[in-house]
């Protein structure tokens, strides 16, 4: 009897050893178990098993769907650091069914995993299945796969990948955080890319297939190396934050049918330079191009009817915003974006220099309209201006001369202009409410409404021709002897010794400096 039992045991051991050699690795088994999908009543389970071999190979056998585990219930989770290779065995002949799915979180955190074999029977991969597999640089996905869960390869070491032909949707966060990702081959039938699919990935260039018609928010946000993107031809909406914080993005080929540039779409794209918005664009969202520091000029297409606030704020090199002929909602005045009806200043480009004359009829300064205009020095303000919205003049550090055409503004309006204590408020003689030498604590001075603004002429230019020469000595002498008059701007330039008086001492100093060939 004992010999019979021993014989049976040896036979079973031999059969098991033979099975391990034929189906999987010949190495000793570290651990094993069942992993098949339970039915809704937990009364029956798919015939699927797993085993981890001593050499780090994790093997799967059986048929049907793998149980969709939660993060903490993956049976081999405690061995994550030991797993180097995953092999999912296919059928031994075409008549046998086989494994159809890979569970969510199946191999998440397997930092030493370098090789994966997936049979052509698998149709679905669960969310985060290969998340944070830092050593996994390549993987071959069979064309049988029709569906993938969120973040399948998030923060993995993938460098390149070919996506399955049956895949129509690229899920949320598929390649998010894949810092080494270099290239992706897209399937011909791909129609949708969900939010953050490539965010924080290492892509440098990417051309998306024209079959894609929907892309959700933040698809390429925070891709530090991304330089060039060609968007799908039929994409109509560039969603919120799609390229946010892509610091090296230089060139974008927009879809010819694009209608909406979403909020924050190109926020903080530091190297984005000039581009052409398609004529089809109708809406530019809130802060769409905010802080694009290399942008030098932009043209608003004729069909644009909505430009939300701060769309181009903080673009320090932006010299001008142009508007295409025929636009019914907006216009460009001296490179500054305004509403077509002339009642609101929308955006002053960040690199605007010198002087801007706000046209008569303007009633409103939009929020952040003059934000960070460091090169703007003088502003002419019409009597019609009544409203300045939030932070309309933030960080205009060199804007020190304000020329008012109307009555003295109230304290509330001046406060919203964020005027420096070093600034001078110029006003027209006869306009009510003004006081001299100060008004509400600000230094004041007269001007005559001339296009030659006080403070804009070089010292000594008493005739206002933009140059300083002997003619200015003659002109100043004529003024002092009552032979001719000078404007307020010329009078300020004539005060060459800066004592707030124009007299013979200024004439003498001007003559001496010209004779000596020195500047004032």
Range-by-range predicted roles:
Residues 49-50, 105, 309-310, 356, ...:
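Short, T/G/N/S-enriched strand-turn elements that build extracellular solenoid repeat scaffolds
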Residues 16-24, 451-520:
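Cellulosome-associated attachment modules in secreted, modular CAZymes
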Residues 9-17:
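Bacterial N-terminal signal peptides
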Residues 25-111, 129-131, 152, 369-372, ...:
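Surface-exposed repetitive/solenoidal architectures
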Residues 103-106, 126-129, 149-152, 171-174, ...:
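Consensus positions within tandem repeat domains that build extended binding/scaffold surfaces
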Residues 1-9:
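Positively charged n-region of N-terminal signal peptides that target proteins for export
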Residues 36-39, 89, 323-325, 351, ...:
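Short, solvent-exposed loop/edge segments of extracellular or virion-exposed proteins
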Residues 57-64, 81-100, 111-124, 134-147, ...:
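Structural signature of tandem-repeat unit edges
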């Amino acid at each position: 009897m004992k010999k019979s039992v021993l014989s049976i045991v040896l036979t079973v051991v031999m059969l098991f050893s033979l099975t391990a050699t034929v189906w999987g690795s010949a190495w000793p088994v570290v651990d094993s178990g069942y992993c098949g999908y339970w039915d809704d009543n937990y009364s029956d389970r798919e015939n699927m098993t797993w085993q981890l071999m001593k050499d780090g190979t994790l093997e799967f056998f059986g048929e049907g769907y793998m149980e969709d585990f939660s993060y903490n219930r993956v049976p081999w989770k405690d061995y994550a650091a030991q797993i180097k290779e995953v092999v999912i065995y296919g059928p031994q002949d075409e008549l046998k069914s086989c494994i159809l799915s890979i569970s969510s979180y199946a191999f998440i955190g397997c930092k030493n995993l370098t090789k994966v074999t997936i049979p052509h029977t698998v149709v679905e991969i669960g969310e985060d299945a290969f998340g944070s597999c830092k050593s996994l640089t390549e993987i071959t996905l069979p064309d049988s796969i029709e569906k993938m869960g969120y973040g399948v390869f998030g923060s993995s070491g993938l460098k390149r990948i070919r996506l399955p032909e049956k895949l129509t949707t690229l899920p949320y966060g598929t390649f998010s955080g894949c810092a080494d990702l270099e290239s992706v081959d897209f399937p011909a039938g791909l129609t949708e890319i969900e939010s953050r699919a490539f965010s924080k990935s290492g892509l440098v260039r990417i051309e998306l297939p024209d079959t894609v018609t929907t892309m959700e928010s933040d698809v390429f946000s925070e891709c530090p190396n991304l330089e060039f993107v060609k968007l799908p031809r039929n994409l109509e909406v560039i969603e919120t934050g799609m390229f946010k914080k892509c610091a090296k993005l230089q060139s974008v080929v927009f879809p010819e049918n694009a209608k909406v540039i979403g909020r924050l779409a190109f926020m903080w794209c530091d190297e984005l330079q000039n581009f052409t918005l398609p004529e089809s664009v109708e809406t530019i969202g809130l802060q769409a191009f905010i802080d694009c520091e290399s942008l030098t000029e932009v043209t608003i297409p004729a069909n644009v009817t909505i430009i939300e606030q701060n769309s181009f704020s903080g673009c320090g090199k932006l010299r001008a915003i142009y508007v295409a002929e025929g636009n019914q909602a907006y216009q460009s005045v001296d490179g500054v974006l305004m509403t077509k009806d002339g009642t609101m200043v929308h955006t002053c480009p960040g690199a605007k220099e010198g002087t801007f004359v706000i046209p008569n009829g303007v009633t409103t300064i939009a929020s952040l309209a003059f934000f960070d205009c460091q090169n703007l020095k003088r502003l002419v303000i019409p009597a019609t201006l009544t409203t300045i919205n939030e932070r309309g003049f933030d960080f205009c550090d060199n804007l020190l001369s304000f020329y008012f055409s109307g009555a003295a503004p109230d304290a509330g309006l001046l406060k919203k202009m964020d005027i420096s204590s070093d600034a001078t408020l110029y006003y027209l003689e006869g306009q009510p409410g003004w006081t001299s030498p100060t008004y509400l604590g600000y230094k004041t001075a007269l001007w005559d409404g001339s296009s030659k603004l006080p403070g804009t002429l070089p010292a000594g230019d008493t005739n206002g021709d933009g140059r300083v020469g002997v003619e200015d000595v003659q002109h100043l002498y004529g003024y002092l002897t009552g032979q001719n008059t000078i404007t307020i701007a010329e009078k300020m330039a004539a005060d060459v010794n800066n004592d707030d008086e124009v007299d013979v001492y200024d004439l003498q100093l001007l003559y001496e400096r010209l004779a000596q060939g020195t500047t004032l």
